Amino acid sequence: DRRDWRRWLQRPGLGEEVSLKGGQVFDTLELGIVAAARGYGVSIGDLVMVAEDVAQGRIGLPWPVAVASGESYHLVWPRARRGQERFQRLRDFLLAEVAAMRLPVVERLA
């Protein structure tokens, strides 16, 4: 539906002359990323999803900036199980994984 492209192109200096009337629309970010990696064009993606591809040189970033999408990930579980150690271990593991991620260095635009 091109929401991410609209968010991106609203930033000054990034899209004054770009039309959203044409182009392919994919059902998932992953499909767009695969198409870009294969040389079919430019795609909007999630930095977490492309970090390894950028580090390995399979995908390039056209600009060193990222635009916040307003989307996020949440870990939830029932209140009654809040104190269970296995949920705390999962939470701690996920936080450690996120902290260890090597994301591309970009300026983040709100």
Model-derived features: positions:
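C-terminal effector-binding regulatory domain of bacterial HTH transcription factors
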Residues: L47-Q56, A66-A110
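Short active-site alpha-helical segment characteristic of glycosyltransferases
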Residues: L31
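A ligand-binding cleft/hinge motif common to bilobed small-molecule-binding domains
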Residues: V34-R58
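Short beta-strand-to-loop elements that line the ligand-binding cleft
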Residues: V18-T28, A66
